[in-house]
Each structure stands twice: as structure tokens, then as C-alpha cells.
Amino acid sequence: MKLVFCILSTLLGTFAYNPDHIAGTTPPYLVYLKSDYLPCTGVLIHPLWVVTSAHCNLPDLRVILGITNPADTTEHDVEVSDYEKMFRHPYFSVSSISYDLMLIKLRRGIKHSYYAKAVKLPQHTVPVNAMCSVSTWAYNLCDVTKEPDSLQTVNVSVISKAECHNAYKAFDIRENMICVGIVPGRRLPCKEVTAAPAVCNGVLYGILSYADGCVLRADVGIYASIFHYMPWIENIMKNN
């Protein structure tokens, strides 16, 4: 099936997992976290701070803003920064998707520009049925050994915890989680960069912890609810 999908995608000239996806420039808050292992997605929330999933605590991370195609080494208007320190949530465990959040303090502040701008943080929970933009990078399925080469965004809605539980019966969907996507997901080949953000009306409400499939094709994803972690986020930023 993967081979057929690869051939069709090559003929059509696209590797979009969802026909409703949006391709284009990188959202100014979106961060590509490059490592010697696997990349992750992050979000700029302050000139000195990036938030991502705790499972992205990977060796030799480099923080890259403004990049559309990580496989293109000639891309312009890209800003690269080293990090000073990582702060994983103290309750995070690799055996669970709970508390899957991490803050990264940059070595130097990112200058506000068209290509780099911090996203707003939430002051309340996100309502069910709210429309959100989920962005991350997709891999070319014909050669997943290379860097991902396609930035994509899909607009999907927040679903209820009951709907989410129906999609993920093996998981305990807690108050500090939100679920975004379509039930049920579509079982097509896909590979994307993990830790995609859910931004609703310009506000960051979620960071992806888990998805059985790919969020770029609108499969349901379980996200850390940023609002529920605001006390921890504010405390780390204030004291470091």
C-alpha cells in the first residue's frame, strides 16, 4: 500500500495526507527542532522560550525558525539558535502521555520579525468545536531517510472527551488534555514530525502528545492542554 501511495503521490506531485491541507509559509511561531536522532516541532512563546513535548528531549537540539522545507539547505530567512537549558515537566514519564510538556530556554533572544513571532498563550480552556490550525512537517514517503520536506497545516476542530475516549479507549483522557481531529481517522500511509501545535484563533491551546496516525490528515490527536500548564510555564519562565 505504501508503494502504491508513493507512486500516486509522485505522479500527482504532492505528499499531502489530507486534501484539505494548506501548504505555504511557516507560521511565525512554528519552530523546527533538529537533532541527531529525530526532529520535533516546537512553538515560540517568548523571545527566549520555546514549548514542545517532553518526549522531544533529544540530543544536540538546534532551534530553527522560519523554515518551510528542512530538506532544502539553501532556504533563506531562516534563524538558528542554540538552547541554554531544557525543562521537562517533573511529572512526565516515558511510559505515559500525561504531563508531556517541555520548555526550552534559548541562549539568545529571537528578534520579532515577519518570520519569527511568539504565539499568544491561553487565558481559559478551549471550547469543544473550536476550530484550530495544526501545523507540522511531513516526510516524502518515497524516501523517509531524508529530512521532512513539506510544511503543511490542517484546520480541524476540538472534540469532546467522550468522543476522544471512543477513539482511544486504552487511554485515560484527563482534564489536562484536549483532543483535536476527526473520528475515526483515515488509515493511509503517513509520516510527520511529532509535537505539532494546535493554535485556535491565534492562541496556543495544545501540543501533540499522541496520535494513532497523522494529525495532518486530520486523525484525532491527544494534546497537552496548555491552559492547564500555565502555572508551571509561568513559574519556570519567571525563575529561570
UniProtKB/Swiss-Prot annotation:
GO annotation (BP), single: protein maturation
Q: What is its main location?
A: secreted
* Glycosylation, residue list: 155
Its GO CC terms are: extracellular space; secretory granule
Q: Where is coiled-coil annotated?
A: none
Q: Molecular function terms in GO for this entry?
A: serine-type endopeptidase activity
Keyword Ligase on this protein?
no
> Would the keyword Secreted be found if you checked this record's keyword annotation?
yes
User: Where is this gene product found?
Assistant: Secreted
Which protein family is named in the record?
A: Belongs to the peptidase S1 family.
Name this protein carries in UniProt? Putative inactive serine protease 58
Q: Which organism is it from?
A: Rattus norvegicus (Rat)
- Point out the gene that encodes the protein: Prss58
